[in-house]
């Protein structure tokens, strides 16, 4: 079977998935920044769109969002979900695809996870282990 016909095993996104995901990310970010969605919750929040992951068939876009300041995340996710149909139509007009992808909104928790790891690395037990490892390597 030729290589370009093999299914993506889900381990790594294809170049096409990455390219389309970035186009969808730009479209959603632009719509939100311009106030294109008439929703009181979204009008009251600045929402960042750090990442969009596309399914291998490009029919599903998982959009990771984060309200600036990290407040009211659940409220913003509900508002985006409520306006999903409008946003999907806008994405289909702005991004040239055979099918408009279904949109799925998720909270981007990478900053929370990074903060948790930073706190863990600063704990006395981990500091002691790190110091012990560096002493052994000398």
Swiss-Prot record:
The keyword Cytoplasm appears for this protein: yes
GO biological process: maturation of SSU-rRNA
Primary localisation category: cytoplasm
PROSITE patterns, sorted: RBFA
A cellular-component GO term for this protein: cytosol
Domain of life: Bacteria
Keyword vocabulary terms for this entry: Cytoplasm, Ribosome biogenesis
Cellular compartment(s): Cytoplasm
Pfam families, alphabetized: RBFA (PF02033)
Coiled-coil residue spans: none
InterPro entries given in the database record: KH_dom-like_a/b, RbfA, RbfA_dom_sf, Ribosome-bd_factorA_CS
PANTHER family: RIBOSOME-BINDING FACTOR A, CHLOROPLASTIC-RELATED (PTHR33515:SF1)
Family the UniProt entry places it in: Belongs to the RbfA family.
Subunit structure: Monomer. Binds 30S ribosomal subunits, but not 50S ribosomal subunits or 70S ribosomes.
Listed name of the protein: Ribosome-binding factor A
The species this protein was found in: Rhodopseudomonas palustris (strain BisA53)
Gene from which the chain derives: rbfA
